[in-house]
Amino acid sequence: NIEGESSYKKYDVNFSLDRKKVKSISALGSLDFTEARPKIDVAVNLEEFQLDAFSPLGENVLSKIRGIASGNFTLKGFLRNPDMDGDLVLENAGLQFPYLNTDYDFDGNASVGLNGQSFEFRNINLIDTKYQTTGFLEGTITHQNFDLWSLNIDVDTPNLLILDTKNTE
């Protein structure tokens, strides 16, 4: 349900999407279009939400985002670049860095914090899908308007495939 006032500039949001009889995403809050820059104030709950829907957001920085997410977070602020606040647990997750030609699975459940415009990865055990080398990932992936992306990632490893490109002159 999304209901608007008579001005059609403010909306109450009460939304859910069921997948296989599980409410995989629900959102409750408001959208406000009364100012030049629309605002959002929504609480979101994910339960076994398929992450592959987010792959297009990563464009050429991240791809093949996969796995399922569960957790709660809020979206507040300007609609095009809201602040996020919350925590997610990822299962059977992984992602690819096309520029590095590397693809990783997250071993076990992974904890990801949402803070501002950043996704905070917390001591995640990585396994590269090509050679099965391992390492630990911590750091942030930050966006601006879900368009400009930056990585601030630390990888602790004695043996993890970091770059898998061909040498060209």
Please describe what each predicted stretch is.
Residues 1-169:
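Interface amphipathic segments
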